[in-house]
Swiss-Prot record:
Record's keyword annotation contains Cytoplasm: yes
GO CC terms: cytoplasm
Cellular compartment(s): Cytoplasm
A GO molecular function held by the record: translation elongation factor activity
Protein name according to UniProt: Elongation factor Ts
Region (Involved in Mg(2+) ion dislocation from EF-Tu): 82-85
Principal cellular location given in the protein's record: cytoplasm
Classification via InterPro entries: EF-Ts_dimer_sf, Transl_elong_EFTs/EF1B, Transl_elong_EFTs/EF1B_dimer, Transl_elong_Ts_CS, UBA-like_sf
Entry keyword set: Cytoplasm, Elongation factor, Protein biosynthesis
Species whose genome carries this gene: Desulforamulus reducens (strain ATCC BAA-1160 / DSM 100696 / MI-1)
Keyword Protein biosynthesis appears in the UniProt entry: yes
Family: Belongs to the EF-Ts family.
Lineage of origin: Bacteria, Bacillati, Bacillota, Clostridia, Eubacteriales
């Protein structure tokens, strides 16, 4: 079996808009052949964004969300290609959902490529220490660390998080569904999340559960 590198997965993701794990699985299925992987994703309905990936998305919206009582605030910039789509109900609904996702799930980055090598290495060191403290054999520790790093990405990277309205999908998969529906590239560019009293000693409330409950109400 051909070795599937991170750069191959990244390229396939950029060309198709499919999720990171979907890209990795596709490459594994076709022995690392990029063009066959694209065809595989299209056949599976996971590459609706393929033809849009190279387009420029310079329109869009900055969506805001304030959680009840003004305790959490989010601003997120989501881009599309035309002003017409920026006013589209589905696009605006997506922007609102993503803003609420950020409020509830506390991502630190949009995508895994934004996570610095230093942060990843530091996280790996912590995970190695945890595995060894659990009494795991050293020979399997590295495999365990790689698996836990994937879990780390799903926690801190917005696009890889389970979508708060449907945990069977990732945020990226939801975006791809909108891309297929509206026919334009959609890209989350950046976000900022504020939480009242963040960094200060205070009573701990489960804000994520509150936001999730509000969404389902």
């Amino acid at each position: 079996m051909a070795e599937i590198s991170a750069s191959m997965v990244k390229e396939l993701r950029e060309r198709t808009g499919a999720g990171m794990m979907d890209c990795k699985k596709a490459l594994a299925e076709v022995g690392g052949d990029m063009e066959k992987a694209i065809e595989f994703l299209r056949e599976k309905g996971l590459a609706a964004a393929a033809k849009k990936a190279g387009r420029i998305a310079a329109e869009g919206v900055v969506e805001s969300y304030i959680h009840g009582g003004g305790r959490i605030g989010v601003l997120v910039e989501i881009n599309c290609e035309t002003d017409f789509v920026a006013k589209n109900e589905d696009f605006r609904g997506l922007a609102k959902d993503i803003a609420m996702q950020i409020a509830a799930a506390k991502p630190e980055f949009v995508r895994r490529e934004e996570v610095s090598a230093d942060k990843i290495e530091k996280e790996k060191e912590i995970l190695r220490a945890q595995a060894l403290n659990e009494g795991k054999p050293e020979k399997i520790v590295e495999k365990m660390v790689e698996g836990r790093i994937e879990k780390f990405y799903k926690e801190v990277c917005l696009l890889e998080q389970p979508f708060i309205k449907d945990s069977d999908k990732t945020v990226q998969q939801v975006i791809n569904e909108i891309i297929a529906k509206i026919g334009e590239k959609v890209d989350v560019r950046r976000f900022v999340r504020y939480e009242m009293g963040e960094g200060l000693e205070k009573r701990q409330d489960d804000f994520a559960a509150e936001v999730a409950a509000q969404i389902k109400a």
